[in-house]
C-alpha cells in the first residue's frame, strides 16, 4: 500500500549494469543455495512451491514465515560491498557496483542520494539481493534448517511449534544483527501450512492422499479476477469509442 521508489537507469547505465550482471552471475551461481529460486536462471516460483511441499510432507509441518521489511530499500551498502569483496577482487567492478548503489533517484524533479538500499528497476538489483541473502541461506544451512527462498520471500519448515518459535527468534536476530536488515515482526509468524500464503499459493492437507498439496490462494485468485475485470472493462471502453 506504500510508495515504492524505482531507480530506472539510463540506456547507457542499463547497458553497463547488464554487462556487470553477465560477468557476476556465473560466478555467484556456483555459490548460491539450491533452495534459492528467485531471479535465477532456469528457476521459478513453481519449483519453490514443489520443494516446500516435499519438506512439509517429510514431517516439517510448522512454518516460520519471516517478512523482511522494505528489503530492497534497507540493504546496507557497506555490508553488501564487504560480502562482494570476498569473491570479487577486480577494483573496477567493485567501483562500478558501489557507484550503482549510490546513484540516487529523482523525486519531483529533485535528486536524492541513495544512502541505503539497492535501486529497484535496474538490471543488477535482483542479483545483488541474492548475493546479500545468500548469507542468510548459508546460516540456515549451517543450522540444518529446511527452507525455501524466493528473493526476499523466505519460509522455514520445522517439526514442532517449539522449534519454530526458537528458529523465528534466532534467525530474526541473525538477519538484524549480522545483515543489518529489518524483520517485520507484525507480518512474520509461526503457523501450520494451512495458514500460509506463499508466492500466491495456499496449502491444504489432502486426506485421501495423506499429504499436503498447493493451489492458488483465494486472495491471489480474487486479485487476478479483479484485474481481469478491470482490463476487460477498459477494452470494452475502447471498442465502444469506435462505434
Q: Which residues does each PLM region occupy?
A:
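Non-catalytic terminal/accessory segments
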Residues: 1-243
Amino acid at each position: 500500500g506504500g510508495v515504492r521508489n524505482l531507480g530506472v537507469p539510463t540506456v547507457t547505465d542499463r547497458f553497463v549494469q547488464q554487462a556487470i550482471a553477465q560477468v557476476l552471475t556465473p560466478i555467484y551461481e556456483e555459490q548460491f543455495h539450491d533452495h534459492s529460486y528467485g531471479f535465477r536462471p532456469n528457476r521459478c516460483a513453481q519449483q519453490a512451491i514443489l520443494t516446500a511441499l516435499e519438506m512439509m510432507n517429510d514431517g516439517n509441518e510448522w512454518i516460520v514465515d519471516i517478512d523482511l521489511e522494505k528489503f530492497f530499500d534497507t540493504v546496507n551498502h557497506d555490508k553488501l560491498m564487504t560480502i562482494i569483496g570476498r569473491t570479487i577482487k577486480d577494483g573496477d567492478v567493485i567501483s562500478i557496483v558501489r557507484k550503482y548503489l549510490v546513484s540516487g533517484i529523482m523525486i519531483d524533479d529533485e535528486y536524492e542520494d541513495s544512502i541505503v538500499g539497492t535501486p529497484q528497476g535496474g538490471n543488477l538489483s535482483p542479483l545483488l539481493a541474492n548475493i546479500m541473502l545468500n548469507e542468510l541461506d548459508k546460516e540456515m544451512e549451517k543450522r540444518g534448517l529446511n527452507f525455501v527462498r524466493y528473493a526476499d520471500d523466505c519460509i522455514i519448515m520445522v517439526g514442532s511449534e517449539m522449534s519454530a518459535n526458537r528458529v523465528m527468534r534466532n534467525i530474526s536476530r541473525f538477519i538484524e544483527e549480522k545483515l543489518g536488515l529489518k524483520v517485520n515482526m507484525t507480518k512474520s509468524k509461526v503457523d501450520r501450512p494451512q495458514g500460509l500464503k506463499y508466492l500466491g499459493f495456499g496449502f491444504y492437507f489432502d486426506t485421501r492422499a495423506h499429504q499436503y498439496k498447493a493451489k492458488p490462494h483465494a486472495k491471489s485468485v480474487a486479485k487476478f479476477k479483479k484485474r481481469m475485470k478491470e482490463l476487460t472493462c477498459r477494452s470494452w471502453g475502447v471498442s465502444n469509442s469506435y462505434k
